[in-house]
Amino acid sequence: KVTRKGGGSALPWKTELFRGIVRSAVTEASRKGVPVTVKMRVGIDAEHITYLEAGRIAEAEGVAAVALHGRTASQAYSGQADWSAIARLKEAVTSIPVLGNGDIWSAEDALEMVRQTGCDGVVVGRGCLGRPWLFADLAAAFAGSEVRVRPGLREVTATLRRHTEYLVDFYDGDEQRACRDIRKHIAWYLKGFPAGSTVRHQLALVDSLQALDDLIGTMDLDVPWPGDAAEGQRGRAGSPRVVALPENWLR
């Protein structure tokens, strides 16, 4: 829906349009002292790579930082992110921070990305789904600490409950809407925990805070962190695809 209209990863292909948008955003935001950052992918597909030129344009137009996800739009989240592209962007863009993104599932992944690419920091996406404590792990890792957060099921479900409460507030008290929203996060929160298929199915249909509380109450909350079973990829990987673009966009 985004690239079909020339947005997202399609936009940097039109370099002057991209330049104009970045310039306008930086100019207007600077009036209020707001920094502008640009996050992008490697390109549209393997034949239409845009990130190096887009990074240089963004740098020249005064953005505060650039972030790169090491996949093309056509890859979606399939395969592995190409961290070497982040390294090449870091070599090309020298006056502002370059942030890396893609396949950061743990603090150790973040440290390894920085080691391999020389990037100035990382951006986390799918890795924090159902796992907001990942940011505490990242902060500890970059501070040189080996301490990692490993919550048991009691703490995880309490975090899930609090997340749902925040959604209720966000939706102005609409519990049903909030619960519909939280459903997609439940499997990520419970990844690796022995919650049972029946409870998981019922949680996927939850429609109120009370229903959520009742189902959490049926679980053995003394279960500790499940270790490797809770680690690894989160979210859908998807499959490579043809990117929808406006007519004649690549000419």
What is each PLM-predicted segment?
Residues 7, 38-40, 70-72, 95-96, ...:
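A short, structure-level motif marking secondary-structure boundaries and short turns
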Residues 10-13, 37-51:
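Active-site mouth loops of central-metabolism enzymes
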Residues 1-13, 68-78:
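Glycine-rich, proline-tolerant flexible connector loops at the mouths of alpha/beta enzymes
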Residues 39-45, 69-73, 103-105, 127:
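Active-site beta-loop-alpha junctions enriched in small/polar residues
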Residues 1-8, 25, 29-42:
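N-terminal small/glycine-rich loop or linker at the start of catalytic domains
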Residues 16, 20-23, 27, 31-35, ...:
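Alpha/beta catalytic cores of nucleotide-metabolism and tRNA/nucleoside-modifying enzymes
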